[in-house]
Amino acid sequence: MSTQEKLISHVMKEEPVGCRNKVTVVGVGMVGMASAISVLLKDLCDELALVDVMEDKLKGEAMDLQHGALFLKTHKIVADKDYSVTANSKVVVVTAGARQQEGESRLNLVQRNVNIFKFIIPNIVKYSPNCILLVVSNPVDILTYVAWKLSGFPRHRVIGSGTNLDSARFRHLMGEKFHLHPSSCHGWIVGEHGDSSVAVWSGVNIAGVSLQTLNPNMGADGDSENWKELHKKVVDGAYEVIKLKGYTSWAIGMSVADLVESIVKNLHKVHPVSTLVQGMHGVKDEVFLSIPCVLGNSGLTDVIHMTLKPEEEKQLVKSAETLWGVQKELTL
């Protein structure tokens, strides 16, 4: 008799049950691992799968997490370069791709990452045909469109992390300005996750008090308090972090876990995430941009119709045209 047999006697033969909330992270770079640890620390999955082409790095990262299993609620952490390890995932977070270099725009990255997606997406679909795809790789809006096209999934199951982080950066900066917690500062960044994002100044409020009623010039050129600078800091935020530490990771990882939580817990929370916006706010082309969306167990269930000022709508359309200009050149 083995030690195990001496110690444990089975009452019944356990039937293998599938995981209810299996989360897969594709890509174990800085963003992938920050997303993985954020998901684990928030107890959002009963199994975590990691996938990457770099086998040693993948094995090392998985072992490192497994060694901490005692401190986590999730003890099943698996990793392989073979996508069969991802089978039956509820949410698949795609962070893989070429990393943005210092000074490189997110749009520059695009064709490099499209080619990577041509391998990744069909493999995800093969093993988790009912999953929700959460795309994080940059340029996220274009790559969410690419993932949607390559997967054949309905649009509600392909979501881009979009401006969820930009809006968090914006609310953090508002909080600093007013010495308040970011959760008490309300403001939305929509459009492209990147250089042409749009700050919805008309919706910025604290405790329901619209700041534009207190400062009608807020966000405009004639604003003595120069609030426009706050939005510029949001746009420059990632570039600044990349310049200082070489990459961004923690905030985007926490942002990803925030989105995963709304999905797996069916919270019906509203997030600014990237979705198909064709036919909304004057956008004519088949592009993905961030607007406020409701996330739950089925994925992206609803879209909130924002009241945008003509200037804000114009910026959104311009953002869409910029993305479409790049998209139509892509070879899928």
Curated annotation (Swiss-Prot):
Key words of the record: Cytoplasm, NAD, Oxidoreductase
Highest taxon of the lineage: Eukaryota
NAD among keywords: yes
Subcellular localization: Cytoplasm
GO biological process, one term: lactate metabolic process
Pathway(s): Fermentation; pyruvate fermentation to lactate; (S)-lactate from pyruvate: step 1/1
GO molecular function: L-lactate dehydrogenase activity
Binding site for substrate: 106, 138, 169, 248
Pfam families: Ldh_1_C, Ldh_1_N
EC number: 1.1.1.27
Binding locations of NAD(+): 29-57, 99, 138
Root EC class: oxidoreductase
Chemical reaction(s) catalysed: (S)-lactate + NAD(+) = pyruvate + NADH + H(+)
Xref: PANTHER family: L-2-HYDROXYCARBOXYLATE DEHYDROGENASE (NAD(P)(+)), L-LACTATE DEHYDROGENASE A CHAIN
Protein family membership: Belongs to the LDH/MDH superfamily. LDH family.
HAMAP family assigned to the protein according to its UniProt record, in alphabetical order: Lactate_dehydrog (MF_00488)
Subunit description: Homotetramer.
Listed name of the protein: L-lactate dehydrogenase A chain
Organism: Fundulus heteroclitus
Name of the gene this protein is made from: ldha
